[in-house]
From Swiss-Prot:
Its EC number is 1.14.11.-. Residues 1-39, 120-171 are annotated as: Disordered. Fe cation binds at H307, E309, H395. Belongs to the JARID1 histone demethylase family. The lineage of its organism: Eukaryota, Viridiplantae, Streptophyta, Embryophyta, Tracheophyta. It catalyses: N(6),N(6),N(6)-trimethyl-L-lysyl(4)-[histone H3] + 2-oxoglutarate + O2 = N(6),N(6)-dimethyl-L-lysyl(4)-[histone H3] + formaldehyde + succinate + CO2; N(6),N(6)-dimethyl-L-lysyl(4)-[histone H3] + 2-oxoglutarate + O2 = N(6)-methyl-L-lysyl(4)-[histone H3] + formaldehyde + succinate + CO2. Residues 704-788 form the FYR C-terminal domain. It is found in: Nucleus. This is Lysine-specific demethylase JMJ18.
Length: 819
């Protein structure tokens, strides 16, 4: 049995020996075995003559210009043809990109603790299966131990990191001490200095710094040809609630006028996953490690083992500070070859655990991969640089010393085909999914339909977002092909079941809104379709396992379809640009019902009516003087509870009245909607709800569908919201403000649930109403005038108040003074 080290030895070798005792630290270390790295002397040393540095080619390095750096997704799309064949690449930002790291705040650096894992580096590749491993071996090897360890992204549940006997038997999941960053840095420096210690002929220690090549050669010597045990700590997979992000977020308080370029940037990993054009923006939940970044605090030799990202997503890693990280990447085209090579050389480990690579605890030399014909490439990531990995690209690596990095996933539209392959593979492996792939796929299709419709509408705005979505559509477009492939897959599986058409039923819209629906057999996501039986109303199967659900008669079974095959075929045609199908799907996406009868009626009405253009109405009819008074009048006469818009004391500034189109769609009982109407109003910024910003509300011509309402954040024109309803248009803005507030951890007042779209446009401001009414002296917009003549002003005021369900008190919201 190994003798525990003397207390004096521990004090002598700890990097914190010159600091006063920390009671919390003592509590942390008590949880570990006396022989853990933090308690032991660093006795092992560098063996340069036995270095095993892999000789492989470097992956490409990209240096975007300031202009290219503005849009991360556009830049990734630009470099993809050059970088994807390597599976990995390095991106060096412009020299002006120097985001401050919030982790260096004294309260975080010195006071906030984070958990670590112990990683036994010498067993990452060459180890015996747990069942064959002699129980005494661990103690025996510790006598000549070196120090080193932890692990990389596991995706494991907290239960897998417990100290239960079962967890202890699982390789790579031993919990280490809790450290502050200050403590961890000192410990990491002490370990590295001791390990690479050099002495001159007189026995004096020579100060020197090992190169990346020196460290790399020693690392692979330890992994491939170990002589002693080497353990290190690794603060891996640190969730947002532990240390938080290294980037400042929009809601956080900070000093300096240039901070907005960092808090709002897409290269800020808190913003990246949900950028317009990333399919992950259609995922409602904040999935830790996927949509919410994880931190990694490393020391020399701490490792992240070979793995691919969940759902074969892209990943982006930013190196906040510290010493370099060395990466190795294998392109997705070589993924199967890597798996085959590792199975060949590590047969016992794979026999015991067929899904070994899912555990992220197995390292494997790039030199052996190269010998097996697997393409592998190297990246050295320095502080302030990004590393991008591509779909299904295996990657691994280690740290050269104390450092901190942060990573998150992203899913450009080209990922969809890879994501589909991933969920089919997961189904075969009976592996649970993290995302609903079909929900993301349909979300992308809906967004593309909206973009195509907005671009096709009269005066459609060709903003960056809409044009980007358009580029994925058309015949053989990336998104079109993804929907087409999914349609063909569904058709084939329904046909293979051979069920009667009477068994096909419409899936309820909220089928999976409140709970995850997955196949009882293979865990396949059931957002698009599901098979069920009367005998088990709460259990469902995917179409591949429908016949395995139960032994009941086929007639008792049913198939739920979110969309029929005809509807999905129509969606494909809509994305290809077929106008009739685009109208149908625009109707669905924009939230109104559409039928052939309605279309016929609308066509006949529009074909008979004349468009009367009164020109740009002179807005000097006391509008500038009146519109602020209108707010007071509306608030005093509406009665009832206040909407958000009324509570804010909305001041709508008219910009252009536009001109009238005389058709029944261009008015309703309560307002007239002139084509070209534009107004300005202040409301909470959808990107930063802590401040108020101007929005431009306008009315466009959507052809047969009548007016199309658009609201745009004036300072950020790409932030536009379209709908065929003024009310729903502003509700979209409200929802976005709430979503952003939630993601930034800002409070959401429970009564802040309602907004009056007509009021936000200005269609309830008396002076604006009067000016619009003057455009129709002959009362040709019959529905509006009939209602106005038949009802009293009190009735109209009652309508306004009846649409308001929220009551707000004036004061501050998110720290902003209400107007």
């Amino acid at each position: 049995m190994e003798n525990p080290p003397l207390e004096s030895e521990i004090k002598e070798d700890m990097s914190l020996k010159n600091h006063p005792p920390d009671k919390d630290k003592d509590k942390d270390t008590i949880m570990e075995q006396p022989s853990s790295p933090r308690h032991r002397k660093v006795v092992a040393r560098w063996l340069p003559d036995e270095a095993q540095r892999p000789i492989i080619n470097d992956a490409p390095v990209f240096t975007p210009s300031l202009e290219e750096f503005v849009d991360p997704l556009a830049y990734i799309e630009k470099i993809r043809p050059l970088a994807e064949p390597y599976g990995i690449c390095r991106i060096i930002p412009p020299s002006t990109w120097k985001p401050p790291c919030r982790l260096k705040e004294k309260s975080i650096w010195e006071q906030t603790k984070f958990p670590t894992r112990i990683q036994t580096v010498d067993l990452l590749q060459n180890r015996e299966p747990m069942k064959k491993k002699p129980k005494s071996r661990k103690r025996k090897r510790r006598r000549n131990s070196r120090m080193g360890s932890s692990k990389r992204r596991s995706g494991s549940s907290p239960a897998e990191s417990t100290s239960s006997p079962e967890a202890e038997e699982k390789f790579g999941f031993n919990s280490g001490s809790d450290f502050t960053l200050d403590e961890f840095e000192k410990y990491a420096l002490h370990f590295k200095d001791s390990y690479f210690e050099k002495k001159d002929s007189g026995g004096d220690i020579v100060k020197w710094t090992p190169s990346v090549d020196d460290i790399e050669g020693e690392y692979w010597r330890i992994v491939e040809q170990p002589t002693d045990e080497v353990e290190v700590y690794y603060g891996a997979d640190l969730e947002n609630g532990v240390l938080g992000s290294g980037f400042y977020k929009r809601a956080e308080k900070f000093t300096g006028s240039d901070m907005e370029q960092y808090t709002l940037s897409g290269w800020n990993l808190n913003n990246l996953p949900r950028l317009p054009g990333s399919v992950l923006s259609f995922e409602d939940c904040d999935i830790s490690g996927v949509l919410v970044p994880w931190l990694y605090v490393g020391m020399c030799f701490s490792s992240f083992c070979w793995h691919v990202e969940d759902h074969h997503l892209y990943s982006l890693n930013y190196h906040h500070f510290g010493e370099p990280k060395v990466w190795y990447g294998v392109p997705g085209s070589n993924a199967t070859a890597l798996e085959k090579a590792m199975r060949k050389h590590l047969p016992d480990l794979f026999e015991e655990q067929p899904d070994l690579l899912h555990g992220l605890v197995t390292q494997f030399s790039p030199s052996i991969l190269k010998d097996e014909g697997v393409q592998a490439y190297r990246v050295v990531q320095n502080s302030g640089e990004y590393v991008l990995t591509f779909p299904r690209a295996y990657h691994a690596g280690f740290n050269c010393g104390f450092n901190c990095a942060e990573a998150v996933n992203v899913a450009p539209v080209d990922w969809l085909a890879h994501g589909q392959n991933a969920v089919e593979l997961y189904s075969k492996e009976t592996r649970k999914t993290s995302l609903s792939h079909d929900k993301l796929l349909l979300g992308a299709a809906y967004e593309a339909v909206k973009a195509l419709w907005e671009l096709s509408a009269s005066e459609g705005k060709e903003n960056t977002t809409n044009l980007r979505w358009k580029s994925f559509c058309g015949k053989n477009g990336t998104l079109t092909n993804a929907i087409q492939a999914r349609l063909q897959m569904e058709e084939g599986r329904i046909t293979a079941l051979g069920r009667d058409s009477s068994s096909l039923k419409k899936m309820e819209k909220d089928f999976d809104s409140n709970c995850e629906r997955e196949c009882f057999s293979c865990f396949y996501d059931l957002h698009l379709s599901a098979s069920g039986c009367k005998c088990s109303p709460e259990e469902y199967a995917c179409l591949k396992h429908a016949d395995d659900l139960c032994s009941c008669d086929v007639k008792d079974g049913f198939i739920l379809l979110r969309y029929t095959m005809d509807e999905l075929s129509s969606l494909v045609r809509a994305l290809e640009g077929e106008s009739d199908d685009l109208k149908i799907w625009a109707s669905k996406v924009l939230g109104i019902e559409h039928s052939d009868e309605d279309q016929t009626k609308t066509s006949s009405v529009i074909s008979e009516e004349k468009k009367l253009k009164e020109g740009s109405f002179d807005l000097n009819i006391d509008l500038e003087m009146d519109y602020q008074e209108d707010v007071k009048e509306e608030a005093s006469t509406s009665g009832g509870e206040l909407t958000a818009s009324e509570n804010l004391g909305v001041s709508v500034e008219p910009i252009n009245l536009g001109f009238l189109i005389f058709g029944k769609l261009w008015c309703n009982k309560y307002a007239i909607f002139p084509k070209g109407f534009r107004s300005r109003v202040k409301f909470y910024n959808v990107l930063d709800p802590t401040r108020m910003s101007n929005y431009i509300s306008e009315v466009l011509d959507a052809g047969l569908m009548g007016p199309l309402f658009r609201v745009t954040l004036e300072e950020s024109p790409d932030e536009s919201f379209f709908n065929v309803s003024a009310q729903q248009c502003w509700e979209m803005v409200m929802r976005r403000v709430k979503d952003t507030s939630t993601s930034l951890g800002l409070p959401i007042l429970p009564q802040f649930e309602s907004i009056n779209g007509l009021q936000m446009f200005g269609f309830l401001s008396p002076s604006i109403v009067q000016a619009i009414e003057a455009l129709d002296p002959n009362h040709r917009l019959v529905e509006y005038w009939n209602h106005k003549n038949q009802t009293s002003s009190d009735s109209k005021d009652h309508f306004i108040s009846s649409n308001c369900s929220a009551s707000l008190t004036k004061g501050k919201l998110f720290g902003v003074d209400l107007m």
